[in-house]
Amino acid sequence: TTELIRAIAQKFGVQVYNVLTGFKFIADIVRRNEDKGEFICGGEESYGFNVGQFVRDKDAPISCAMVAECAAWAAEQGKTLYQLMQDIYAEFGYYKESLTSLVRKGKAGVEEIAAIMADMRDNPPKELAGSPVTKVVDYNKPEETGLPKSNVLQFFNEAGDVVSVRPSGTEPKI
């Protein structure tokens, strides 16, 4: 989702768990760790977010309440939410994420998506944005990730960039 979460959590000594995409995986982490500490929040790349342990799924009302609370706190400091984000970037660095989807419909689309994933596994890129790839993580190999098997690949380069590739589980896209 974003490594900015990890950077902020690290400053405050808060444990971060990486899970597969989907709130069922976030809810599972909450369930398995209920007796070990407080769950603060969880989020995923589709902008779903959850705060606290009450609702173990995407929770738009609490997310809106948290944004309102952040805005109120920022106003008390004489700042806007934008200025607060600039403060965060100044302290932790700027993180940029983007999502690109390729839609491939029908049976031919399913086959093309499978072929793209197979090719990415067999012929991983040597560079990302001109920087050498230093690590490839294949989520089809639970022994590499400690997570359930999933059709996901991640490529890391020397510059610190990360590219994740996965077919959607609900739509005809990769």
Q: Where do the language-model regions lie?
A:
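Generic C-terminus detector
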Residues: P172-I174
